[in-house]
């Protein structure tokens, strides 16, 4: 229970007790006053009745005496009255009604005296009755004030809790409580402090005193211990939780310096764990077990809370933060404190793990601990004070390295207090663990590009081909393989490529996007500004690829004006702008680039055009001289006239070659034999030749026809006209634009012979173009008759013949297969093919 809850409970109990006491005191006082008033009233009434009774008796005697005298007589002389003896008052019933006294007599004086006394008693009674009312009013006011104070306190606590939740470190508020009960570790540190100071002379780290090292959290630690006891009951305890709890008395810096021999277990076992390992613990004792450092512990957390705490990295970090009270930064001091406090951790650090494992018995293996967060950056100062809940939040250090999991099943004799058997040795690994490879000289080998494969386990009882491989039979060329498949070279190359792709732009004149394009093209040129300047002056020295990139770098008119008007430092410009500014200083610079590119590509263009012209001429000659193609046309003509008998299409003397592509669309009654199949069968029967011979013969006779079908005559004619137009611009550049300046004489002298030679070649190409067009028109008229303007393409006839030859080869193959299978009439057996 928190301190605020205790305060509220105590205040409520105090109010209840005070109200009860006040109530009983008021009630008792009022009852006593009432009883006293009743007693006084009864006594007064009795006295009045007695007095009234005595007077009545005297009057009655006097009346009786006067009557016995027998008449009216003068009153006797007064005589001294004898002394009346004090008679006891008559015994009358308290409810007896006495006669009224005679008015004007002694009774009146007596009533007057009684009235004064009654008035005094009534005023006293009213004063006594008003006293409890005042006390009740005071108690009510006190209760109201206490209630208002309680409401104010509750509202203040609620606001404070809301503020804590809203703070960034609110999630750690539950773990930042500080207990005033110091643990045993404080006395340990105080005991070893003189030895540490004597060994190190007070230098290095600073050991904190007991008030600073007091256990910061008693309640979370009790919860951890109780959770550990509960886990041992249901078989869900683990070495990780035990080790994390025992190591909570030390800082993370000490945990980080634990030697490997301790297997990651903290050397600070609790007294409870030692007693558990020495004697068996009954379930009743487990339920009564508590931490020796905290005598009063809260409730034991449930299994769900323990599982969430065990599997949550944030909870483990917060628990470690809450119990870590100081950080000793000096390495030597930490090791000295560690060795003096827990000498058994150096030799048998793993013994506590074995004891916990022996106690766990036949417990189920716990789930693996979550991976620890990355370690924090190194601290700058040598001493860090642990902040409580009143101070600012401190970033929690990461948890220690989790210990290895316990064995799956422990022997039963260990749970009954028997000797602890050593664990069985681990099985040999399937593959050797990875280790950094080293070369012959001991230097580590560079990492290469991996080859992904599946390893094969060696079978000891089976002979394999891999057993015959000798390790010394093959040696690698390390330099070659590193140069080809090394990561460093490739990464450096990629880094250079990335830098080249995204260059840093300095001072520039042109637009940024346009300048980036110029920079990319400049990389394709791969030449300096001086080399390009010299090549443009002389007319040679650059390849076709470089000239094409330079042509693409030609700036617009406004861009050229900006670069020409720039009169600043040329070296301050980016490389692309500097190159353009140097090039623009040459007269007709980009016209020269076009002329040089024309000269470089002229020979290739002319060769392609001449080859196409020659192929067209050969194709025309093949179509006019092919005899087998003529026989095929004859067979198709006769078959078509037979099928068109009685129609307007019958009796034809010729047909356009487009009809050859329709022969495969006319199918027979069997649904598979086409008209082309019939024509091929008739040709093989009449000529006593194989169908394959027909297809092969036509393919050999019409070889160039198939090639010509891929030629576009319009492209050829456009190429010839383009060459002629380019030569005209070069003549204009050399003859007029560059003829007046002496600096241009080198370029003019170099281009003049080429201009003369190119003129002659272009004239030959123009003559060849006219000749080829004449042949194409002639072959088209040879097959189709008069060709009008409706002819879409002069070379369409070559495309038709190429497609028909492909269909013919397929049909001839089918006919030959049907004939080989059945040996009879292939037309009758074509359905079985």
Swiss-Prot record:
Where it sits in the cell: the answer is: Membrane
The segment(s) forming the FH2 domain are 438-833
* Name of this protein: Formin-like protein 2
The record lists the membrane-crossing segments as: 136-156
- Residues of the region (Disordered) are 26-130, 199-234, 254-326, 340-435
* Major place of residence: membrane
Task: Enumerate the InterPro entries for this protein.
Answer: FH2_Formin, FH2_Formin_sf, Formin-like_plant
> Which ranges are annotated Basic residues under compositional bias?
108-122
Q: Which organism is it from?
A: Oryza sativa subsp. japonica
